[in-house]
């Protein structure tokens, strides 16, 4: 059974070999590196390649779209603004959603309140009718 030291030395050697290959590819030039990857994109805009890759894999996630948008704006020289909602806008959205829910529940709450009030009044009436007259007991 190999020791931990032997395994770590072997791993380090493999990593060094991979680093050497990467450095060698970087030195051999752009064309050879493109051939190694299997793409010839030296004259294509980057976002076209990203679009083709995204369409071929049916990727419609926000990361791909954001990357495409950033690249287009970099190439056109326009600054890229990330469309994020700030904290205030999120709070406003929550308040609007809460208001919408309250508006939908308002008629139901009114009916429930009326029924509850009627039940309370009915219970009070029953207790009043069941209790003996206190006014007559005090006079005697």
Swiss-Prot record:
Keywords: mRNA processing, mRNA splicing, Nucleus, Phosphoprotein, Spliceosome. One of its GO terms (biological process) is mRNA splicing, via spliceosome. Its main location: nucleus. It comes from the Eukaryota. It is found in: Nucleus. The modification Phosphoserine is found at residue 139. GO terms for cellular component: Prp19 complex; U2-type catalytic step 1 spliceosome. Signal peptide: none annotated. The keyword Transcription regulation does not apply. Belongs to the NTC complex (or PRP19-associated complex), composed of at least CEF1, CLF1, ISY1, NTC20, SNT309, SYF1, SYF2, and PRP19. Present with 1430 molecules/cell in log phase SD medium. Involved in pre-mRNA splicing. As a component of the NTC complex, associates to the spliceosome to mediate conformational rearrangement or to stabilize the structure of the spliceosome after U4 snRNA dissociation, which leads to spliceosome maturation. This is Pre-mRNA-splicing factor NTC20. It comes from Saccharomyces cerevisiae (strain ATCC 204508 / S288c) (Baker's yeast). The gene is NTC20.
């Amino acid at each position: 059974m190999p020791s931990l030291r032997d395994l770590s030395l072997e791993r380090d050697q493999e990593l060094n070999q991979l680093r050497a290959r990467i450095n060698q590819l970087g030195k051999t030039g752009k064309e050879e590196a493109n051939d190694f990857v299997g793409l010839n994109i030296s004259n294509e805009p980057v976002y076209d390649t990203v679009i083709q890759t995204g369409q071929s894999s049916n990727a419609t996630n926000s990361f791909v779209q954001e990357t495409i948008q950033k690249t287009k704006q970099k190439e056109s020289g326009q600054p890229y603004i990330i469309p994020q909602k700030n904290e205030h806008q999120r709070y406003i959205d929550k308040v609007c959603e809460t208001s919408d829910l309250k508006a939908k529940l308002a008629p139901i709450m009114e009916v429930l309140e009326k029924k509850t009030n009627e039940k309370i009044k009915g219970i009070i009436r029953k207790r009043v009718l069941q209790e003996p007259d206190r006014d007559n007991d005090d006079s005697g």
